Design a protein with these regions (language model features):
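Small-residue-rich helix-interface/hinge motifs
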Residues: 39-96
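Metalloprotease/metallohydrolase-associated module, dominated by Zn2+-dependent proteases
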Residues: 2-34, 42, 79-244, 252-254
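Active-site rim/adjacent substrate-binding subdomains
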Residues: 249
């Protein structure tokens, strides 16, 4: 086989992978927006609902660690609610606000990272492996025993298997699917953004905590977090779609 033929085959293969990944992006967005609104398919939406709750609660806990506090444990429940238990220094209003914001914007930051990794097959495998490893570690270290541990361990294990066994195009598609879930989680759970009281606990919501610590109306902080997540989603999509349609010399090198 001549070098020109090998280069042509690599180019065709790369284009096929890009098309698969773009199709996965489109169907991921459609599924995320449609499943909760179709009664017959509502059961299929539940695992995605739980995933958004995990992302939200881990965002709180990891932010607490980043600002010098502790992340004790977290729990998610079959109805989609969840709670993260963390500790901060006394009278740390600003830190409290940051921890509250972490649950709202943290998933969008993770999504942007995954969109960047999904531009290349190897990056997609690395992203899936990191995701799976993080969920397995969270299940072992900070997840509440029972439903939370089972869900995190199962999803994390599946992600590790996917990283090892999926073809290049499917690995990219899987990571893009997860990135879309993270990006849209703050919108599919609009109760996170524009309510003063968290349901069903009746405690102040994250945006109410931010308003108490930093001033201003709670809905303004919800709007700010929502716009930040939207910006990350748009930038991630532009970066991903632009890169997936280009061929580099590295892609064609034998």
């Amino acid at each position: 086989m001549s070098r020109a033929t090998r280069v042509a085959e690599r180019a065709i293969h790369r284009i096929q992978i890009s098309r698969q990944a773009r199709a996965a992006l489109l169907w991921s967005i459609v599924a995320t927006l449609a499943l909760p609104r179709i009664p017959v398919l509502h059961t299929l939406w539940l695992p995605l609902l739980w995933l958004s709750t995990v992302a939200h609660e881990l965002g709180h806990g990891l932010t607490a660690l980043l600002v010098g506090g502790s992340f004790n444990r977290f729990v998610i429940r079959p109805d989609g609610s969840g709670t993260a238990f963390s500790s901060l220094p006394a009278d740390a209003n600003v830190l409290d606000a940051l921890v509250s914001a972490g649950g709202l914007v943290g998933p969008a930051i993770v999504a942007a990272t995954w969109f960047i990794l999904a531009r290349r097959p190897l990056g997609a495998r690395v992203g899936l492996a990191l995701f799976g490893g993080a969920f397995v570690a969270a299940a072992a270290l900070v997840a509440d025993p029972g439903f939370t541990q089972i869900y995190l361990g199962s999803v994390g294990g599946l992600a590790l298997v996917a990283a090892a066994l999926l073809s290049a195009g499917w690995a990219q598609g899987a990571l893009v699917f997860l990135a879309v879930q993270m990006s849209l989680s703050v919108y599919t759970r609009s109760d996170y953004l524009f309510t003063e009281v968290a349901a069903p606990s009746g405690a102040p919501s994250d945006v109410a905590n931010m308003a108490h610590a930093l001033g201003g109306p709670y809905w303004a902080w919800g709007l700010a977090c929502g716009l930040f997540s939207a910006l990350v989603l748009v930038l991630g999509l532009r970066w991903y779609i632009g890169a997936s349609g280009k061929l580099s010399l590295r892609d064609l090198r034998s």
